[in-house]
């Protein structure tokens, strides 16, 4: 069974405490320059985890990813190109 996952971006003052985020989910990426970490966890637990993480003194802010709510199914490019060509021809005539 596959669980729905969602990313949480955790902005931190210091990166020393990145290891402590592992208990909340999978730490996918850490940016040393911008001082943030991307944490993946179950979608059902996102709000609870973001509240818990935001209470730590080393956390500046917590943002949730909107990727699960975006449309990822696209029309084929060929159909779109064909429609655009027909529109151009009709306009030019």
UniProtKB/Swiss-Prot annotation:
Membrane-spanning intervals of the chain: none
Enumerate the UniProt keywords alphabetically: Cytoplasm
State the InterPro entries in the record: DUF2129
Gene Ontology CC terms: cytoplasm
> Record keywords: Cytoplasm included?
yes
Its signal peptide is none
Q: Which Pfam families match?
A: DUF2129
Q: Where does this one sit in the cell?
A: Cytoplasm
The UniProt similarity line reads: Belongs to the UPF0298 family.
Q: What is this protein called?
A: UPF0298 protein lmo2054
Lineage, uppermost ranks: Bacteria, Bacillati, Bacillota, Bacilli, Bacillales
């Amino acid at each position: 069974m596959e669980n729905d996952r969602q990313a949480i971006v955790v902005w931190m003052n210091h990166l020393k405490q990145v290891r402590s985020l592992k208990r909340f989910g999978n730490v996918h990426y850490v940016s040393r320059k911008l001082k943030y970490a991307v944490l993946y966890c179950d979608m059902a637990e996102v709000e609870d985890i973001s509240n818990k993480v935001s209470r730590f003194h080393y956390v500046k802010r917590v943002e949730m990813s909107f990727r699960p709510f975006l449309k990822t199914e696209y029309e084929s490019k060929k159909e779109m190109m064909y429609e655009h060509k027909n529109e151009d021809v009709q306009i030019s005539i």
